[in-house]
Amino acid sequence: MQFLGPIDWIFVVLYLIVIAAVSVWSIRKSKETTSDYFLANRNLGWFVIGASILASNVGSEHIVGLAGSAAKSGTVLGHYELHSYIVLILGWVFVPFYLRSSVYTMPEFLERRFNPQSRRLLTIIQLISYVIAKASVTIFAGALVFNQFLGVDFWTGAIILVVVTGVYTVLGGLHAVMYTEAIQAIVLLLGSLVLMIFGLQEVGGWDALMQAVPKEKLNMFLPLSDPEFPWLGILIASPIVGLWYWCTDQHIVQRCLAAKNEQEARRGTIFAAFLKLMPFFIFLIPGLIAYALHAQGKIQLDDTNAAFPVMVKSIMPVGLRGVLAGGLLAALMSSLASVYNACSTLYTIDIYKKSHPEASEKQLVKVGRIATAVIVLLGMAWIPLMGRIDDGLYNYLQSVQSYLAPPIAAVFLLGVFFKRLNAQGAYSSMVIGFILGMAKLTLQIFQHDLTPGSFWHSFATMNFLYFCIYLFVFSIAVLVIVSLSTPPPPEEKTAGLTFSTTVAEDKAASRASWNAWDVALSVIVLVVILSIFAYFSPLGIAG
């Protein structure tokens, strides 16, 4: 159903014109080198980095999924939206090692620290993860939103946006992606903030909302008996997924690799950590508002997945609806562009360049563009398949990530802290962990064909949070045992890539890159997170 008026369409068209203009400007500015195309010539400041990190994270699955999940399950999935502390870990722990190694990709860093086999394996895992956990979900959710907002045929709208996003990504590389992302982040956040404000006014204010929503929906720490989100499971598993996503995933870390220097990269992550606090309120809280308005009889909410667009349709005035439409277009285009560029970088640097070391700069850029075009086509091919995904896209996304994250998070985290860990341990941990994770996902998909009570059925239906924890511990055990059972890594594999092997000169340079303000701002982020946890717990509003 179409509910945008002429004024709304003016906002949508103006937004698209601005994005097109920025893309053309960045394309003309591009220098046609791999450093420029894939890492924006390593010349970006903290504001663009921070805004781009958030824009890369916030996709249409957030708009459709998070608000819908809040309307259905309450605030418990807010754990994943309060990962600002993990973003700080990226800036304070991992960024110095990544920048000193001057790598283009995360698999390349893994080769520096371990061996080429680890690099190749991580490349394959990351490319698979982009298909099953990022691009496909984003395309499906974005197409759904596009249909509900603009009244355009579901598949037609998806194809148009996927192609438009692919064109400016192919032509402009990371320059086009990051500068348009900075704009899109602002549009998306402001539009969603306006919706939350109007929603609170409609429901009667914050206190009225807290009274209208049952206490169990306001509790972020559900009982251990909860079948989906027991507090112990989500409290431990959520940071594991966060470490993988924020600290080792190509399409997030790539923003930091494009920084002018370590100071700009770290401050970009601090800025992103502040921005990351906002989705909890502007995406999750509207879901609670939709639940409350439905309970009050003010809106009709037959499908919780439609919570966000139903609110826009019901309570937003003409004109501002266009702002939200622009924000949702921004979310879809930003996430897809980020995935396209990350996949292009992974393929070109970690696969093509390894087999064609003599390739020129222009040839690599050309291959990158071709790779992006292929990814665009694969994304379009996935659209019909996404119709088979059950409701609850956000839940699906988190469960898939819980099966992919543990071994990679273990290898990266322990790899920078302990120099004794070697390539054999890292490779074994990732191979075994990946096989177990994919086995869990496959059996879960076909669980209805398994005999209830059997081992395989029990394995398939195991809570995804607990499975994530078990797999993380098991991956660490494999990593440590195999490493200690084999010779230590050669010195060149650890020099400057672990805390104990960082030379004094690098330590001094890293220390000079931050000051008391950086520390104070980071502490403020942590205090805000703890305050939110306390408020939405049995000690606070849910008590």
Region spans (language model):
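Membrane-embedded helix-loop-helix hairpins and adjacent transmembrane boundary segments
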Residues: 1-543
